[in-house]
C-alpha cells in the first residue's frame, strides 16, 4: 500500500489547483506551475483537501510519486524554494547579472551559467550564491549544475558546496 499516496493534501485558500486533460496547473501568490499528471491516478478536491486514488495495484509507486509532486508544486507556489551554495577556496568568486552567474573558481576562464526560466540566481556576497524559484525540480537542478562546476574535494575542502552539506575529509599522504 502506498502510504504517501493515501495522505490528503491541504490546499490553502490562496492556491488553486485545476486539471485540464493530462496536465495539472497550480496557481498561487508566488507564481504558476503546470505539469503532466498521469491519468492512472485520479484525485478529488473537496473543501480545501485533495485525496488521491489509483486504478490498479500495479500503480502503487506512481500513486505516491504523483501525490508528492503535487504537494511540492503547492509548496512552491505558496512559499517558493531556495538553495544556498558557498564557494570555498582562495580567489573563488561569484557575480550575478540578471539571470546569469559568472563563477571564477580556479579555471583559466570564468564559467558563465544561465538560469532556466522561473529560477532567479543572486550572489549575496562574493562567496555565497542563492538559487530561488517556485519549481523544486528547476531550483535543485540549477543548484546542482552550479555545484558541478567545481565539486568540493576531500583533501582541502575547496570547491562549491551547499550550505548544509558535509564534506568528508581525507588525510593526505604521510611523508617521511
From Swiss-Prot:
Belongs to the universal ribosomal protein uL6 family. It holds the Pfam family Ribosomal_L6. GO terms for molecular function: rRNA binding; structural constituent of ribosome. The keyword rRNA-binding applies. This protein binds to the 23S rRNA, and is important in its secondary structure. It is located near the subunit interface in the base of the L7/L12 stalk, and near the tRNA binding site of the peptidyltransferase center. PROSITE patterns: RIBOSOMAL_L6_1. The gene is rplF. This is Large ribosomal subunit protein uL6. One of its GO terms (biological process) is cytoplasmic translation. Part of the 50S ribosomal subunit. Signal peptide: none annotated. It comes from Lactobacillus acidophilus (strain ATCC 700396 / NCK56 / N2 / NCFM). InterPro entries: Ribosomal_uL6-like (IPR000702), Ribosomal_uL6-like_a/b-dom_sf (IPR036789), Ribosomal_uL6_a/b-dom (IPR020040), Ribosomal_uL6_bac-type (IPR019906), Ribosomal_uL6_CS (IPR002358). Keywords: Ribonucleoprotein, Ribosomal protein, RNA-binding, rRNA-binding. The keyword Ribonucleoprotein applies. The lineage of its organism: Bacteria, Bacillati, Bacillota, Bacilli, Lactobacillales. GO terms for cellular component: cytosolic large ribosomal subunit.
